[in-house]
Amino acid sequence: DLRVEDGIITEIGADLASSPGATFLDGENHPVTAGFIDSGTTIGLAEVSGLGISRDGEQVDDDMTAGFQVYLALNENSSLIPIASNDGITRGLIVPEAGDSNYAGQSALVRFTRGAAFLQQQTVAQHLYLREGDRRRAGGSRSSALAAALEALEESARYDEQRRAFNTNKNRAFNLDESDLIALSAVRLGKVPLVVQVDRAADIIKVVTAFGAYPRLRLILAGATEAWKVAPLLNVENIPVLINVMENLPQNFDRLGARLDQATLLADAGVRFAFFSGSPYSETRSLSQAAGIAVAQGLSW
């Protein structure tokens, strides 16, 4: 028997005494598991992938959107939420998509279960996209994309040092809006983690090295198709990874090292990881499927 109070398992045992007003659910011969958390989806921000007017997850015509907050656009009545909860997903990290800026904005945490407050946390992380196709947002080169990301952090440091002068317009002009500067300052100071979407092993090394210059910055890698190649480095630097093991095809030159057993290789190297679906469009069930594939490829229960 399981006793659940306010969504929390409070007691496990045989023939537990009933409580007044308790609701009984017969789950005989069925497995019981904690709710899944999707660590990267856009449920509540988009309804139809090909219909732009139904998508609120990206900001275009702006070359810096670090201050973009997705929680302000969330739809708690989205038609995709019941699908997620039916697939066993009880919480989701709702992430911004890259528009015209490599810094896409700030993600939010929501809860998909009925009777609970939908928005759990307004700001969870800042998201930076440095994949193969993302370099176009910074002039077409990976070098300029990473350099621009670092330069933005440095500008946030200057803002912190000269905030009074900024408010009185007495200092050298800033390239970024104040909302972006405040958002990046929180990243630099470790108040908000930085999630970097990157796939190629060579790029992962450069990202880890570059952002390692900020001792308080909390780095997380997402996608990270070739993270298994640099797993010892990630273990030493204590950098967690968000992965989708079902994306195991070499779809571009950044993903030539894609493989089904990445979760096993990361676990064996001592790297912390979590699964994400990456898409809300009937893909939520892939979260548990990915976990099953990982176990089939050698990951322990």
Predicted features, each with a name:
Residues 211-218, 235-242, 270-272:
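Glycine-enriched alpha-helix->loop->beta-strand junction motifs that scaffold or abut catalytic
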Residues 48, 55-68, 193, 235, ...:
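His/Asp/Glu-enriched, well-ordered alpha-helical/loop segment
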Residues 2, 7, 29, 40, ...:
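Divalent metal-coordination and catalytic microenvironments
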Residues 27-95:
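Metal-associated gating/positioning segment near the N- to mid-region
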Residues 1-33:
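Histidine-rich, glycine-flanked metal-binding segment
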Residues 195-199, 217-226, 246-251:
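Catalytic beta/alpha-barrel core
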Residues 37-39, 92, 126, 194-196, ...:
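Hydrophobic faces of well-ordered beta-strands that scaffold small-molecule active sites
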Residues 80, 85-218:
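Polyanionic/metal-chelating signatures
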